[in-house]
Curated annotation (Swiss-Prot):
Heterotetramer of two alpha chains (FadJ) and two beta chains (FadI). Pathway: Lipid metabolism; fatty acid beta-oxidation. It catalyses: an acyl-CoA + acetyl-CoA = a 3-oxoacyl-CoA + CoA. This is 3-ketoacyl-CoA thiolase. It is an enzyme of class 2 (transferase). InterPro entries: Ac-CoA_C-AcTrfase_FadI, Thiolase, Thiolase-like, Thiolase_C, Thiolase_CS, Thiolase_N. SUPFAM superfamilies: Thiolase-like. Its EC number is 2.3.1.16. It comes from the Bacteria. One of its GO terms (biological process) is fatty acid beta-oxidation.
């Protein structure tokens, strides 16, 4: 155990019998840009596709799965409990427990943590965690005026009464209402927050574009070198006329100069955040199979790796709302009993290049550590040779609830290729939330 952190905060994630919690396997759909390959596939179907592929890949007896915890950020009213629909749609035992959670962009870190805690408590032996989201199949709402009028119409008895109510509606009242993109509590969007963070922390347009170019270049190389294919299923969504076996957002011919051509997306005059240095709206799903180390051995599985620790944070939503990794990571490192320098790999969710680079700066800031974290010194400067080595969300895309599981799968597989070690996954999330998880591979 490292002496550089407070060892009194070390919290081993084990069962009562001392078994670690193993990630036996993981899989995901290809991630598709909004309105492309999965344009008519709702999140619940993406979730079913993913979990069924995971069950087929591991050849697990469906009766052995005790629990499914799944997430969806953009909720569909007709299927509010995506986890239960997945159980019912994939051939699992009808008695399999299932519930859904949401933690914005950190959702599948939360579903993983929930399954880990259930295994530690002894309430389940085997669980599936993950998430799916569609930015193409969205719940399009109606105005409050139209909603109240439709309700009143259902209670009228005469044609005159109905017409009288309908006359009160304007064209604005009957226009569709798309899902909100701004924070409910502040009215500030994620993109606006990224702009604020770029200005507050001195992140230049050139630095943001360089990170985006790096992300695409590394992701393209990872696919070209055959490092990603085995964790991505071939998806045949209904009506089964097309299929997809790769992420379709990655720029395989990325050129740094091309990024400078785009106009800022959120602050047209003075901004630096563009569509190219931000993660795109994306469709996809990802899932993990978890169980105790002992149970994995009994069933003949060789685990991908183990969950060493996790931590979640919550901060103010008015300023630096996407700084969650800088708050959650020190807690996760403490709970794992390690320091930043002990890590073999660091994978940070790239919601925006500005947000990512702001967090990278704060990891190394003693001032931030003292004033915001109450710590004597910073956790340390990130070794960029360890950072997002296969590219990040700017390249792969970001189906909100699936990103955490993608990162876990990708990091564990890369650690195994490197002969083992410790990896950090961390993400910001809407609402000022953050997540960090330490992974271990022998």
């Amino acid at each position: 155990m490292s002496n550089s952190l407070n060892s009194s905060k070390y919290q081993p994630l084990t069962t009562r019998q001392g078994d670690r919690i193993a990630v036996v396997s993981g899989i995901r759909t290809p991630f598709a840009k909004q309105s492309t390959a999965f344009s008519t596939t709702p999140a619940v179907d993406l979730g079913k596709l993913t979990v069924k592929a995971l069950m087929d890949k591991t050849d697990i007896d469906p009766k052995l799965i005790d629990q499914v915890v799944f997430g969806q950020v953009v909720q569909m009213p007709e299927a509010p409990n995506i986890a239960r629909e997945i159980v019912l749609g994939t051939g699992m035992n009808i008695g399999t427990d299932a519930y859904s959670v949401t933690r914005a962009c950190a959702t599948s870190f939360q579903t993983t943590a929930n399954v880990v805690e259930s295994i530690m408590a002894g309430t389940i032996d085997i669980g599936i965690a993950g998430g799916a989201d569609s930015s193409s199949v969205l719940p399009i709402g109606v105005s409050k005026k139209l909603a109240s009028t439709l309700l009143a119409l259902s209670k009228t008895k005469t044609v005159y009464q109905k017409l009288s109510l309908l006359r009160t509606l304007s064209l604005k009242d009957i226009a569709p209402v798309p899902p909100a993109v701004a924070e409910y509590s502040t009215g500030i969007s994620m993109g606006q927050t990224a702009e604020q963070m770029a200005k507050s922390h001195g992140i230049t347009r050139e630095e943001q574009d360089a990170l985006a170019h790096r992300s695409h270049t590394l992701a393209a190389k990872a696919w070209k070198d055959g490092l990603i294919q085995d964790e991505v299923m071939t998806a045949f969504p209904e009506p089964y006329t097309v299929w997809l076996d790769h992420d379709n957002n990655i720029r395989h011919d990325s050129e740094l100069a091309s990024y400078a051509k785009l106009r800022p997306a959120f602050d047209r005059k003075y901004g630096s955040v563009t569509a190219a240095n931000s993660t795109p709206l994306t469709d996809g799903g990802a899932a993990l199979l978890l169980m105790s180390e002992k149970r994995a051995k009994e069933l003949g599985y060789e685990p991908l790796g183990y969950i060493r620790s996790f931590a979640f944070s919550a901060i103010d939503v008015h300023h630096d709302m996407l700084m969650g990794p800088s708050y959650a990571t020190p807690m996760a490192l403490d709970k794992a009993g390690i320091s930043l320098s002990d890590l073999t790999l660091i994978d940070m969710h790239e919601a925006f290049a500005a947000q990512t680079l702001s967090n990278v700066k704060m990891f190394a800031s003693n001032k931030f550590a003292r004033e915001c974290l109450g710590r004597d010194k910073a956790i340390g400067e990130i070794d960029m040779d360890k950072f997002n080595v296969l590219g990040g969300s700017i390249a792969y895309g970001h189906p909100f609830a699936a990103t955490g599981a993608r990162m876990i799968i990708q990091t564990l597989r890369e650690l195994k290729r490197r002969g083992g070690g410790l990896g950090l996954n961390t993400a910001c999330a809407a609402g000022g939330l953050g997540a960090a998880m330490v992974l271990e591979v022998e």
